[in-house]
Amino acid sequence: MGFAARPFHIVFSLFVLAGATQALIICPFDSIYQFGDSISDTGNYIRILPNGPAAAAANFPYGITFPGIPTGRFSDGRLIVDFIARVLGLPLLNPYLQQNASFKNGVNFAVGGATALNSSVLAAAGVQIPDIYLIPLSTQLNWFQTYLRSNCSSPTECSKKVQNSLFLIGNIGNNDVNYALPYRTIQEIEAYVPSIAKAVANATREIIRLGGRRIIVPGTFPFGCLPRNLYLFPNGDKDDLGCLRRLNDLSIYFNNLFQQALNSLRIEFPQAVIIYADYYNAFRFLLRNARALGFTSTLQSCCGIGGPYNFDLNRLCGFPGVPVCRNPREYIQWDGFHYTEAAHRHIVQYLIPDILKELKCS
């Protein structure tokens, strides 16, 4: 069962997004398809048995800001993909594993804990994935192909459906790095980062071959600004924002390889619009302008306990006795691993004007 292509007339205030005047934005998207990890998961992980229903994101205080109950989002509220959908005039995406859900305007295939590389590839690099997280990007692509086979009456209909959609591939690859940080050197991790970039590029290539024409591929956030990593490496050299320099250098290396891979894809597929979303600098912008944006805390977790970063690996958000801050809107960091709805909103506000321009929205 397909649906006809139709442009969405999106009216939004650029004062909200970029401090300018009101404008009419028209983007020809029927739907959004999201792939990724817990930064983008709107409820898949909590539906994976046996561990999902007991996951933190399935329980309070996750969802405390929006919609007031847990939804499977690893945050207090809405995610980056939710705000992008809002800008495009589309409803929030339902997770692929939600039974009887409407997928008329797209699907979210992202899963908490997901990796860009398969577990066997990571194991060969000496990286062990926790048994509760075993849904790599390749599995999400298989889900997407299954979805197409179930929702198209012909290859032509599938191609039309895909061409009229926006794809977000990631961000993903964070977990490939973060799982290794406690027991692998930076040099050992750097050795397999090119494989991460290649895996994401191959996924992007597959989407284009299936007919995708507009694709956003985000880079990674600064690894050195995450409370979990600041907790793990308390004596590491820090920059003027309080982030770990060496881990942020790893993020820059990671993102440079991603951009090189995307440049090659643009040459290979000139008919496609492939956009790199600069999550790294968007996040650094939030840290540097925190006070002006309404944040009172930049590196402390809203939900957590202990130490300078309000984070303890042995007492995580959602554990008994672990408190949540009074006003999550004043925090950038949510639980030491993920970000608040307020942070997600400002990241989209930072990125969306350039993204709309590159998508050739008018």
Curated annotation (Swiss-Prot):
The strictosidine aglycone-producing AJM7-DeltaHYS yeast strain expressing pathway genes of the VOM module, RsGS, SBE (GsSBE, RsSBE1 or RsSBE2), RsPNAE, RsVS and RsVH, accumulates vomilenine. Additionnal expression of pathway genes of the AJM module, RsVR, RsDHVR, AAE (RsAAE1 or RsAAE2) and RsNNMT, leads to the production of ajmaline. Ajmaline is an anti-arrhythmic alkaloid commercially used as an efficient drug for the treatment of arrhythmic heart disorder. Confined to roots. Glycans are attached at residues 100, 118, 151, 202. Residues 1-23 form the signal peptide. It catalyses: 17-O-acetylnorajmaline + H2O = norajmaline + acetate + H(+); 17-O-acetylajmaline + H2O = ajmaline + acetate + H(+). It is an enzyme of class 3 (hydrolase). The active site is at 38 (nucleophile), 335, 338. It comes from the Eukaryota. Acetylesterase involved in the biosynthesis of ajmaline-type monoterpenoid indole alkaloids (MIAs) natural products, important plant-derived pharmaceuticals used in the therapy of heart disorders. Deacetylates 17-O-acetylnorajmaline to produce norajmaline. May also catalyze the conversion of 17-O-acetylajmaline to ajmaline. It comes from Rauvolfia serpentina. Belongs to the 'GDSL' lipolytic enzyme family. Pathway: Alkaloid biosynthesis; ajmaline biosynthesis. The keyword Hydrolase applies. The keyword Transmembrane does not apply. Its EC number is 3.1.1.80. Keywords: Alkaloid metabolism, Glycoprotein, Hydrolase, Signal. This is Acetylajmalan esterase 2.
